[in-house]
Amino acid sequence: LKARHGFFVAAALALQIGSAAAANPPGYPQRREVKEFIAEMVKRHGFTRRELNRVFGKAQFQPAIIKAMEQPAETALASWQAYRAIFINPQRVEAGVQFWNRNAQSLARAASEFGVPEEIIVGIIGVETTYGRNIGTYRVIDALATLAFDYPKRAQFFRGELENYLMLSREAKIDPLRVKGSYAGAIGIPQFMPGSYRRFAVDYDGDGLSDLATSPADAIGSIGNFLKAHGWIRGEPVGFAAEVSGEGWRKLAEAGATPANRAAELPGFGVKLAVPVPPDTRCALIELETPGQPSDFRVTLQNFFVLTRYNRSNLYAAAVMDLATELARAKPGLPAPQPNPGRENS
């Protein structure tokens, strides 16, 4: 792990904290659970109480973050086709091809080094931040403090991310009050959570920094590194369109994205693949629902499951699949992409 991270260096120069952001929130430094967290950080990682009291004294509770966590986009829309339309449209495909052309060398290198197709990496960046245009407007300390101490459903997870964020800030020698990201505390072009930033961010442009805010090359290499570390299989597809009949398929769909069944077993569940797949291929069945319309069904493989490690939503992973397919189709000079895993005209 490098002692400095370019994202935080850039943030230090670019962001200013206004007087409103410096106002004390009601009670963070005085709350028992915050005091216990500070004591643990002092004991385990050598922070001083003074510096952490300063940080938590200026961290602000953000009720809008709780609202966003309670109603994420896929839940609010309750429709695969509506969710898909946000990310797969001519404007985002055109912007993605431009991003691809600008970063062709880094993408080719990542595909060779990590085995992840270029269009998958571009697709992730397109879904996450519209190719780096929208990296978030919340202070990361506000997001993580709100979720660590005021969102009991996932407090344990976000306290771990808060711990990683404070360590990352110290390693970068930057004030943790100055960094901005998503409502969940994700950072930079690829929207890495702090724990993933510390584990998987790489310096891919050779400047000595792992800079996920301003370096597309570092973002590209870091995504490839993340996916490979989570089990991406070089040369294997993500998934295929499928048709279902009867009721046996429901058992597969309810089991989730873990590829637990052999392709040869699928006909016994009433599942028919759109393309031939080797019989021993491990796979899962995903149903993508749109009210008032027939569902889309996909037989998904290990690489789809890996995409759900990046964001644990089948809708998200399917959107990355489809955007990647459209990007590969639109990119001049590429071989024909694999068959569209969704509907023929979707």
Could you tell me what each predicted segment is?
Residues 1-8:
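Bacterial N-terminal signal peptides that target proteins for export
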Residues 8-16:
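Bacterial N-terminal signal peptides
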Residues 23-111:
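An acidic, Gly/Ser/Thr/Pro-rich helix-cap/linker signature
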Residues 41, 52-61, 116-132, 165-170, ...:
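Short, functionally critical alpha-helical segments immediately adjacent to catalytic or ligand/cofactor-binding
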Residues 61-68, 129-139, 150-155, 171-177, ...:
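Secretory-pathway/luminal and periplasmic proteins that interact with or process carbohydrate-rich
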Residues 140-149, 187-202, 223:
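Substrate-binding/active-site groove segments that recognize
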Residues 204-212:
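Acidic, glycine-anchored loop motifs typical of Ca2+
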Residues 242-346:
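C-terminal soluble interaction/assembly domains
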